[in-house]
Amino acid sequence: MTEGEVCMFDETTMRCQRAAMSGNWRLFKKILEEDTKCLVEPFDLFGNTAIHVATRSNNPRLLRELLEALPEKDRWQALRKGNCVNNTLLHEIIFCTTVEMASVVFKFEKEVPEEHKGLPLLELTNNSGETPLFRAAKLGKLKMLKFMAQHAQADIRTLFVRFDKYSILHASILGQFFDVAIWLLNTDEKLAQHKDMNGMTCLQLLSNMPLVFRSQAPSMGTMKNLIYYCTSLSQYFFLLPEEGYEIDEDDGDEDGSVDFRQRSDLESGQQDKAKLPSSEFNGIGHIWQRKKQHKLAEHLAGLLVQRDFSWQISFHENFQPLIVMPVLSSKSDRIKHIHHMKEMHKTNSEIFHSKSYRPITTATSIPHSKNYTPLLMAAGSGIVEIVEKIIERYPEAICHVSQDEHNVLHMAVKHRQLKIFNMLKKHSAFKSLVSRITAEGRTLFHQISRMEFYVEQHLPGVAFQLQDELRWYERVRKIVPPHYLMHCDKDGLTAEDVLEMEHRKMHKEAKGWIKETAQSCSTVSVLVATVVFAAAYTIPGGTNQNNGTPVFLGSRVFLFFTVTDVVALVSSLVSVVMFLSILTSPFELWDFRRSLPGKLSLGFAFLFFSLVCTMLTFSATVLLTIRFENHRKWASILFCSAVFFPVAIFWRMQFPLYKMIQRFLKRLFKTLKQAIPTTFINYSTKRTHRINYHIHYH
């Protein structure tokens, strides 16, 4: 502390601060009873009084005794006094776990004479324009919110919106307190249509929160998924939050408190915790809470969908079914032309900025994403639950078109939402969605060719990411009319032109990645082949000096050694061939659709198999040489475990790449199945049914 500076708190206040910090509320009370001035003066750096701090004790008796220690005039001032952000006593009480704390405040409010009363405590706002009710909903305190709502003197719906149009329902949804949001929506249905300062309704806000829904939640792994599906919420969830408390108005005590009989509301934390899985297993409890959030979010979405009619405003006037053919016949000329136009636009923009020009906006400009309806937003976010509920309740909503001529299929395709795409394919109106051309002249081909909304997928390498992009393009090509391939957008580019331009950087990175990977793996494969080739001539146990045959020729372990050595050699050489074929390929864009990723997956599969066989060969060699029959059995088990340890490490490090092998084999099986004539499959099926019929008849 420099000269001239003094501490802003006296010794008594600092003693009281230390008592509050250590949780010694008895000493805290004793100090304040000796000097009641501290009760209404600033107690900390946030401008809280000692009574504000006393709410942290969660002790209604302490709060009541401190308020009773004040004169009547000072008591009313203490109830209304705010801290540095104007949070009053009720604003701070919402953090308490017992509603008795708020009951104490409401009791003293009733005792204030009429001439001293001003605005009710529940209507006082802080610097953000939030009442205690608003703040309770914003922080997910459902129990306290319900209790305070019972003591509101005016219509509580007047307290649900801040001065900046931000509603209490928006705040609870943004905080992911969906049980609170459901209760609020059942209290005031008009909140569903309320728009915030950005023009967003609550359903639009929820449509931009994909991670709170099961369809877009992060992957949890096989074991956690199994626990997720096996965990039941029936006895806890299906009594909805608005039914979770039973309020008995006749059982209030002398303090004006209300007896809350808990039935099944999880938010309060009053239920028998021994019955909850989270009380016994933390891991299961975390999964259970996630499932609860998914179910609450889905239920909230259903309630909001019932009150959303934004899909009725649709723009079909500018529909252009005519195909615009390219002016320049050469693809390279079209790409050069668009690059030239971009450079011209960039130069003009720099000139305008240097002269302090401002861009002219018109009513026909493309709207911001906030003007998309919840249906289109949910489709772009991949939230299957919302899209399904909207289309199920309003079947005609699937034909909704935005101002920039986007429909639900366009949003799903350009955001690469496969679940939405597959869901729409089952709908009878799917063919009509396919032919839509946007205001910028873009077909579904153009949408999938652009990387404007591309999000990097969880794939092991750039080559597989490029393969996924090409697979999307192929998926769209199967459903779009063939003549759309020649259609040009407003820039005069076909979909193939856009695909090549937008994916040029990814194509370059994919070439470098797959080259380096193939070179590294081919080196490992050659080393494995060298080892197993040398092992074939280094016979364990040696040979018979009389006839040159191996000493252990009649042993089963020796036969096992021979087979695994040969298989390891063949597998390693096949993997070398696969990697060399990758290195000698031209690396064209469409080579990354099937050829190169398929070769890489097979190369990895054979390399891993050769490593396993090499370790098996080594195990057989050791067993033949040391003869573990004369030792304990546990030594053999320990040895075999040690042998496969490096194989397990290699598999764990490269596991994402081996997952691609599984996908490759599935697609290979699907391709082979498609190659079989349909008549043969139908004939086999009919023959099977006929045989089953005769057996049943006899």
Tell where the protein language model's regions lie, with residue ranges.
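Membrane-interface segments at loop-to-transmembrane junctions
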Residues: 549-561, 591-607, 634-641, 672
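C-terminal interaction modules of eukaryotic adaptor/scaffold proteins
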Residues: 642-646, 656-659
